[in-house]
């Protein structure tokens, strides 16, 4: 037994080399070996290998070991970055069992740390020799490198950060390779001689991006200087360059967030001392920084920040940038290299075939500003110009429309994160806008197409948000857009008035600048408005089918409708966040009002939602929970859940100026990877027809079933309004104020109208379903846990479809910003049918008319309609027919909000093109050719019109009486094309389409 232990001990020593007294087992086939005290990473010596040209170094004679779970670890020092290739082969006898390619692309110490199962060959084997082969980029060059702290059979370091020395082998590594993968991207922009304009603009940028000077504190500076003097010793060469010094632990385990903060702030304190000309600070600063860089606290070192790490990098990176003015050019180059290493700078160099799939809004938010600083502050002008151009391209690329659910922008103007439209995460827009503003007036500004795409995204934020009424920056979204942060940061606009104004003033493209100024004036009336542009109103209906939502707005109100699909979740539930939020977007219809907080919209203002009935989300159809624990995924406060549909994708909107449609085939899944809730098998066809100031809601085919308790009703929720000082109006039912009296059931055999305290009116016709009205105090949990509750007074109402229903339906009308007298008048008109007519309400089609408008929500192919001129369609889509009696013209708008997702290897899924063919009664032709619309020659008294739908976008076309003398094309191509024109008014450019005028971003001019 003792012999076995001794043998084990000898084997362990034999596989470890520190080179303090010898270099046994190491033999240079070419060049020379020597123990050296010049550089070391352990003890006071290392092994120096000096050679010329291609050379080999062999390690043999140690006790063989099994290459399975353990790793090879060593420190390798390079006096300069050469780009040489060092091949390391692990042998069993003469057979090569593992091969590593180590690139000599750094200066100083770096780790060779690699598991034996991180190679092309991973079979079980014994290792009894190593062979190093150095292939220099210059065959005649003499090279020196140093080895230290070699452990051939080391314990694996699972937390190591592979440096850029592994750019050729990182695909084999089983740790986080994000940084080295970016470093492996080919730098495809050459360093060229800058133009006079580029040099001038570079100086402008350097002035704008100059880091903030570190704050001086005599105590902190003295403490930092004393620490360096007491803990750091360095030896310098005759020319002043660093030779060696105190060993610094640069393993990933040592470089914690706290240690990074300590190191960077210590450097800041010393830099502040240099600024104040404090004696000894310059020497301490240089000694400390030079030693850090030499020891591997540098580019390619063991430092990495996750792209969603928002604390540590915000301290470390600005601190490192702030010391640049106090660095020598060599120090600047290396510090900038470190900053690039940790701020994802390599993302600027994704290849043409990979960059689109790698857009990440977290990287934009966290790192874009630092990327731009690192580029501009490079001391070499030509390199700085090249680097700024790389960041400029990165910015332009990040405005591209990414297919599927990837970050960041979509064709309809929505911003994506976590695979869906997520306004709360579009704080990336702040960083992007700041970078755009930094580039103002320079030749490095992003191109017009990129600027326009980003401007459209900003415009979309303010279209979705409540109007200004109070604080200029207090804007809120519907709670259905709150993600996992309901009634808190998730519903607050994460963009500022100043930034929107900056985007307008910085814009170098005249037409686009005009539109941005108009958007700013419309979003912030009376707040430093631009006086050189025509007025613009945000009122109207908008569609965002990558959300999918409809937005209707007028005056001081905005209404938002939303539902989930199989690709876009309607609610995101995280550990300790939004635990009861699964119903946020179940066909929601939320009416909100401008104000300093959410109280004006009847929402809780406590940032937690405690006191809000999570069952009753306005507009939704839900199965009410009677036990809050059951409403959490798996009944816990930690399990994750994303609320998708159960495979259906027909949900979204059609907008045509002041009218529009929202529709959803709502199917609720209760699983996410695995079952998370007791299934209720909830289904419903839900639609909302928007006619300027009223919204007609129609539901059909509502069903629910399962083993859940019979005390859980299925309901379509009208509203919930939290009573507060800002929302203290009475609840009115059929003209009578309701006291806080608990619950009442309205007679379903008659029409009923209600006026919520927020001033939103509701009218319901006679129905077989009961209408429940509740007014009083309610105690409910916060969104974080069922253990914390709150009590609020609420007025709420919902349609009770019964416990488990089949084939239930509903109709109701929503009138925003009204009062009791107006609602009484509306109720009379709604009741006698003079305001609107529901023409069809079944599993295939919801159709509603008002005035000269007929809206169709086709849930499937349909035929046999006897109203209007539409007789059939071949697939699901939305359609609005507006008849102009004076010209006998039918003005159609159509879209398919179903993106028909198709699996894609690169993007997960992509939207696909679809077509639908309408059959119109009568003989019709297109008033003008329109892209994606093709009229067939009328036959047998009917006309077929084929529509092509892409990306959820609408098509607009006019049908006029067929004129045989006008001629008719033989192919679809003959009847397609785009006929729009530009119009200039007061020096401002607009687009005219279908007789309507739009800004260059597509916003209708009122």
Indicate residue ranges for each PLM-predicted region:
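Extracellular carbohydrate-recognition regions
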Residues: 13-30
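Extracellular beta-strand ligand-recognition surfaces/modules
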Residues: 19, 72-75, 111-151
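Secreted extracellular polysaccharide-interacting domains
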Residues: 28, 49-71, 91-101
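Short carbohydrate-recognition loop motifs
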Residues: 35-54
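Extracellular carbohydrate recognition and processing domains
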Residues: 83, 93-126
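Aromatic-lined, polymer-binding surfaces characteristic
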Residues: 204-478
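Extended polysaccharide-engagement surfaces of secreted carbohydrate-active enzymes
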Residues: 428, 435-923, 927, 939, ...
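C-terminal outer-membrane/trafficking sorting elements
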Residues: 965-1006
């Amino acid at each position: 037994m003792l012999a076995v232990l001794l043998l084990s001990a000898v084997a362990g020593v034999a596989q470890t080399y520190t080179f303090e007294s010898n270099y046994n087992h190491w033999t240079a086939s070419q060049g020379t070996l020597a123990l050296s005290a010049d550089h070391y990473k352990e003890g006071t010596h290392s092994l120096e290998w000096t050679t010329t040209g291609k050379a080999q170094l062999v390690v043999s004679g140690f006790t063989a070991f099994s290459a399975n779970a353990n790793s090879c670890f060593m420190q390798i020092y390079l006096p300069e970055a050469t780009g040489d290739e060092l091949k390391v082969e692990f042998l069993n006898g003469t057979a090569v069992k593992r091969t590593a390619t180590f690139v000599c692309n750094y200066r100083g110490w770096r780790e060779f740390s690699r598991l034996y199962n991180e190679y092309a060959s991973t079979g079980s084997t014994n290792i009894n020799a190593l062979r190093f082969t150095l292939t220099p980029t210059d065959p005649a060059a003499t090279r020196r490198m140093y080895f230290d702290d070699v452990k051939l059979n080391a314990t694996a370091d699972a937390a190591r950060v592979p440096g850029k020395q592994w750019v050729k082998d990182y695909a084999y590594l089983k740790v986080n390779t994000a940084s080295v993968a970016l470093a492996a991207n080919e730098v495809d922009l050459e360093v060229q001689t800058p133009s006079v304009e580029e040099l001038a603009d570079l100086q402008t940028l350097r002035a704008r991006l100059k880091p903030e000077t570190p704050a001086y504190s005599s105590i902190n500076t003295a403490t930092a200087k004393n620490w360096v003097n007491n803990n750091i010793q360095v030896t310098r060469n005759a020319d002043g360059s660093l030779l060696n010094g105190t060993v610094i632990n640069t393993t990933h385990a040592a470089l914690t967030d706290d240690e990074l903060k300590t190191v960077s702030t210590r450097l800041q304190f010393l830099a502040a001392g240099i600024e104040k000309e404090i004696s000894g600070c310059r020497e301490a600063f240089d000694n400390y920084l030079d030693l850090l860089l030499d020891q591997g606290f540098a580019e390619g070192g063991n430092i990495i920040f996750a792209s969603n790490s928002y604390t540590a990098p915000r301290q470390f990176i600005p601190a490192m940038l702030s010391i640049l003015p106090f660095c020598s050019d060599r120090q600047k180059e290396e510090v900038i290299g470190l900053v690039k290493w940790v701020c994802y700078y390599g993302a600027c160099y994704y290849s043409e075939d990979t960059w689109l799939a790698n857009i990440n809004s977290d990287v934009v938010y966290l790192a874009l500003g630092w990327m731009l600083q690192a580029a501009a502050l490079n001391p070499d002008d030509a390199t700085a110009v090249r680097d700024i151009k790389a960041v400029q391209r990165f910015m332009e690329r990040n405005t591209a429309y990414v297919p599927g659910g990837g970050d960041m922008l979509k064709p309809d103007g929505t911003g994506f994160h976590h695979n869906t439209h997520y306004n709360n995460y579009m704080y990336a827009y702040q960083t992007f806008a700041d970078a755009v503003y930094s580039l103002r007036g320079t030749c490095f500004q992003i191109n017009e197409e990129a600027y326009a795409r980003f401007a459209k995204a900003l415009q979309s934020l303010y279209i979705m948000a409540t109007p200004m009424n109070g604080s200029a920056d207090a804007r809120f979204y519907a709670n259905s857009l709150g993600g996992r942060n309901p009634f808190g940061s998730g519903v607050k606009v994460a963009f500022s008035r100043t930034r929107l104004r900056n985007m307008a003033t910085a814009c170098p493209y005249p037409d686009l600048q005009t539109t941005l100024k108009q958007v700013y004036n419309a979003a912030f009336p009376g707040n430093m408005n631009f006086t050189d542009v025509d007025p613009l109103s945000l009122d109207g209906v908008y569609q965002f089918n990558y959300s999918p939502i409809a937005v209707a707005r007028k005056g001081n109100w905005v209404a938002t409708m939303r539902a989930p699909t199989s690709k876009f979740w309607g609610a995101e539930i995280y550990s300790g966040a939004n635990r009861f939020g699964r119903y946020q977007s179940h066909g929601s219809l939320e009416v909100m009002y401008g104000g300093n907080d959410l109280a004006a919209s009847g929402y809780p203002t406590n940032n937690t939602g405690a006191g809000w009935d999570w069952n009753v989300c306005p507009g939704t159809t839900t199965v009410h929970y009677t036990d809050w624990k059951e409403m959490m995924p798996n009944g816990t406060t930690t399990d994750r859940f994303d609320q998708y549909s159960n495979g259906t994708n027909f949900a979204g909107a059609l907008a045509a100026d002041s009218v529009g449609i929202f529709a959803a085939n709502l199917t609720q899944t209760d699983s996410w990877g695995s079952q998370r809730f007791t299934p209720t098998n909830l289904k419903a066809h839900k639609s909302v027809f928007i006619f300027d100031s009223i919204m007609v809601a129609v539901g059909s085919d509502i069903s629910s079933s399962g083993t859940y308790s019979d005390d859980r009703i299925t309901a379509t929720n009208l509203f919930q309004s939290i009573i507060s000082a800002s929302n203290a109006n009475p609840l009115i039912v059929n003209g009578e104020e309701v006291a806080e009296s608990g619950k009442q059931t309205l007679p379903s055999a008659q029409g009923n109208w209600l006026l919520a305290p927020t001033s939103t009116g509701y009218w319901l016709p006679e129905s077989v379903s009961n209408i429940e009205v509740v007014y009083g105090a309610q105690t409910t949990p916060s969104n974080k846990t069922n253990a914390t509750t709150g009590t609020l007074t609420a007025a709420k109402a919902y349609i009770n479809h019964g416990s488990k229903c089949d084939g239930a339906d509903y109709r109701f009308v929503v009138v925003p910003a009204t009062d009791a007298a107006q609602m009484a008048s509306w109720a009379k008109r709604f009741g006698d049918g003079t305001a609107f007519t529901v023409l069809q309400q079944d599993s295939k089609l919801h159709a509603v008319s008002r005035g000269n408008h007929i809206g169709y929500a086709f849930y499937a192919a349909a035929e046999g309609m006897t109203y209007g001129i539409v007789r059939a369609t071949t697939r699901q889509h939305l359609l609005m027919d507006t008849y102009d009696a004076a010209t006998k013209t039918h003005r159609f708008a159509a879209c398919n909000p179903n993106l028909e997702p198709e699996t894609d290897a690169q993007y997960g899924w992509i939207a696909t093109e679809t077509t639908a063919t309408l059959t119109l009664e009568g003989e019709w032709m297109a008033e003008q050719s329109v892209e994606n619309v093709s009229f067939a020659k009328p036959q047998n008294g009917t006309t077929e019109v084929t529509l092509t739908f892409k990306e959820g976008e609408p098509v607009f076309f006019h049908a006029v009486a067929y004129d045989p003398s006008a001629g008719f094309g033989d192919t679809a191509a003959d009847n397609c094309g785009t006929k729009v024109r530009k119009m200039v008014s007061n020096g401002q450019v607009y687009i005219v389409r279908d007789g309507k005028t739009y800004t260059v971003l597509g916003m209708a001019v009122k």
